[in-house]
């Protein structure tokens, strides 16, 4: 086996590297090239860059395409730029807008990985007769004794991206490789300098690529100019406290920007899109221990349908560590997560990544989209 767990000599092994123009994917390309693999770089143009082309901290911006091309030229590997704007708009941006209008808090990076990157780009890699598709994600992939591969949290906990990759299927994992999963970021930057890459000190991307300055409502207004409608801001008992200009301006757990005053801080507890209503309450009303999921991607042992009260750990936000929970998949396919301790600010539309345990290198068992959150103390929803 070579360094990528493939039964071929490196020079006979073609690897397509998804090059975003950042330091991580460029180092992956350089590292594999140095190890003797037949490396082909591919960069995806995903959206109309416009003003974001030169905006610092943006992912996949126009400058990144230039940087990816320059890195490939420096490394002496072929490089292709593919226009995936239509696919990205249909599979990611439009779904993002619909989810927000439904009162959810979507995670577009999960959908992008699920579709454009690990479905469409992986298919392209196969068309190029590649043996593997490698990316610069900080997540680990390990061979399983009985065949196939397992996904694990990265060595560098501060960089671990497993939360965004839970939807990767077992079939995709067989073809994917993540060389940075066993490295820390400082080591990656040191390798970039060693490889002579000019972007060794390039800042990491911070924003979602199509959301300038994190202003989601601006994106929704552009995509659905007539969708936002004003409505009431009410407390848990239905008393009107104020008005708003559209639920797209709010997300569960939000405190700032409500324009309300009172004896205690108020937070967005839930959004009711059919009534254009924002429900607010005290922080205690955000707590939940019971979450329902849809679109389960199962990477664990055995069929998902056999899972009953399985001890696991889950992450309901990328910034939070895995927390102990139990997982049950009902006979009808309903997926329920019961948390050992309450979590605050869990919103429909968010991702829930499932792990075998809460350890630093835990195996990823899959995950799903949060569809329902049962609050501990919130009043029952009024009938629509």
UniProtKB/Swiss-Prot annotation:
Q: What is its EC number?
A: 2.8.1.13
Site entry: Interaction with tRNA: 137, 350
Q: Name one GO molecular function term.
A: ATP binding
Catalysed reactions, semicolon-separated:
S-sulfanyl-L-cysteinyl-[protein] + uridine(34) in tRNA + AH2 + ATP = 2-thiouridine(34) in tRNA + L-cysteinyl-[protein] + A + AMP + diphosphate + H(+)
Q: According to its record, what are the GO cellular component terms?
A: cytoplasm
Cite the active-site annotation: 112 (nucleophile), 209 (cysteine persulfide intermediate)
Q: Which domain of life is it from?
A: Bacteria
What protein name applies here? tRNA-specific 2-thiouridylase MnmA
């Amino acid at each position: 086996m070579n360094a990528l767990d493939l039964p071929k000599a490196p020079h006979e092994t073609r690897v397509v590297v998804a090059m975003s123009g950042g330091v991580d994917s460029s180092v992956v390309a350089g590292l594999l090239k140095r190890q003797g693999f037949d490396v082909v770089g591919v960069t995806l143009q995903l959206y109309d860059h416009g003003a974001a082309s030169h905006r610092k901290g943006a992912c996949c911006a126009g400058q990144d395409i230039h940087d990816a091309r320059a890195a490939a030229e420096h490394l002496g590997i072929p490089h292709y730029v593919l226009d995936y704007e239509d696919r990205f708009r249909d599979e990611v941006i439009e779904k993002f807008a619909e989810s927000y209008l439904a009162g959810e808090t979507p995670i577009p990076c999960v959908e992008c990985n699920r579709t454009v990157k690990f479905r469409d780009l992986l298919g392209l890699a196969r068309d190029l007769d590649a043996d593997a598709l490698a990316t610069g994600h900080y997540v680990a992939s390990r061979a399983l004794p009985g065949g196939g591969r397992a996904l694990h949290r990265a060595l560098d906990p501060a960089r671990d991206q497993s939360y965004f990759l839970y939807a990767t299927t077992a079939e995709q994992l067989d073809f994917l490789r993540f060389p940075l999963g066993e490295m820390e970021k400082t080591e990656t930057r040191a390798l970039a300098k060693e490889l002579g890459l000019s972007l060794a000190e390039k800042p990491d991307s911070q924003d979602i690529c199509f959301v300038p300055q994190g202003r989601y409502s601006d994106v929704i207004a552009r995509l659905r100019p007539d969708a936002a409608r004003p409505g009431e801001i009410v407390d848990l008992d239905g008393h009107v406290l104020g008005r708003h200009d559209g639920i797209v301006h709010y997300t569960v757990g939000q405190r700032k920007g409500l324009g309300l005053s009172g004896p205690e801080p108020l937070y967005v507890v839930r959004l009711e899109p059919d009534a254009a209503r924002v429900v607010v309450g005290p922080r205690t009303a955000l707590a939940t221990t019971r979450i329902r999921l849809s679109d389960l991607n199962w990477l664990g042992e055995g069929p998902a349908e056999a899972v009953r009260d399985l001890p696991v750990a889950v992450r309901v936000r990328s910034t939070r560590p895995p927390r102990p929970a139990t997982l049950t998949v009902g006979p009808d396919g309903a997926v329920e997560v019961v948390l050992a301790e309450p979590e605050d600010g869990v919103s429909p539309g968010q991702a829930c990544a499932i792990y075998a345990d809460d350890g630093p290198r835990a195996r990823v068992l899959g995950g799903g989209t949060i569809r329902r959150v049962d609050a501990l103390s919130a009043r029952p929803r009024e009938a629509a």
